[in-house]
């Protein structure tokens, strides 16, 4: 049975027509918002977090029908299959066991293997942090460069930045992902080879961007005096292909294993997170895992009606498939979470940006929304104008950290006030009559420019304090939200075939850029012209 033919889907279509013009400000009006208040009914705790869903364009019937949709689509069954280690990535014939990486149950899949690798990580991280692991001249390591791309970069970078306040002050962590040499060059300007450790992260150890940067970094070490025989003091590898790591020249003892049953965008919990562990220490890394496990338990045990990942996923479907929203915004009012929107871009769009159903037929409904964002309050001075007064409705996830992780505590009430005020303003709007009063006498023509449509939907996620544990829960919340949506849309969130075609053609174009001549029959006229212009520039 296809999504469009599910009874709950049909019921939601009728329900949408009934409430599509309902006003949030009316639902919050004192005469309508009696105890338990709307905020009380629609605030859901879970995994150490809480979500205020009350400023969404939903009522009790909406949630009831959305939960019915989740049941009819098989969300519970697919969730349980994932945790059990069943094949939930059918196009690659794999399980998706990122949850096993943070499981405490000794009977969880691959528990012994995971525990052994984490113990190896912890031993190494402690040696680097304590100064016992030194560079080739005997100096302690003060710089760690993580070289990877996609899931081998975005997750570790996001977490390391977010938890800077609990990181070692003695070690700086740098991230290089782009094949553009400027990325690596800027980092190399900041580091001393005698005090630098490189972590090369690639599942296959053949990724173009990662290996290009890794080779350039190796050459840099040698050019600055590091004997090739001493490179083992400065290079470690994280991969599912240890033979290729050794072939590159990294000592076999310096190889940390990742597995093909963990997708890249779900891999920060594995040895891919070695840079995180070195920065914050093994004990804090364990807390990060514990927070994710808190959310895993909530996802598995909470009824769907009070289940945070389920409700966030379903509300996203409500806007994407019924209201027709093209994008949704993540606005963390926390500079520590600066890289969370970038991380979620990959998590959401690489997972659910699909058109083929699990049975190989093509969907006739939208799937992943465009995910974007910027920390508050920066976004208010960039794109919030469009959110408030533009004709496009963009659902928003606000993320508010209630207590600061830094010493400048006097800033924090201003930050929180802006977050909460934005959600209120987006919900309330300003009518034309209200705008006339604001404009004042004799300024009738200004009033339309001072109106706000309002009724703009937002969710506010509350985090008591940004700790490794609450961050772990927050990340896992979004991971599971993605699974919920993929299940309803009947797509596979664990593959990413969409990145392959560009890679294949990229190798052809790269060869043409250095060839003596280019066969115009190999490419369309536009691509051929671009290649010819680049060839001319590269010869200068």
Swiss-Prot record:
It comes from the Bacteria. It is found in: Cytoplasm. GO terms for biological process: gluconeogenesis; glucose 6-phosphate metabolic process; glycolytic process. Its EC number is 5.3.1.9. Pfam families: PGI. Catalyzes the reversible isomerization of glucose-6-phosphate to fructose-6-phosphate. This is Glucose-6-phosphate isomerase. It comes from Burkholderia ambifaria (strain MC40-6).
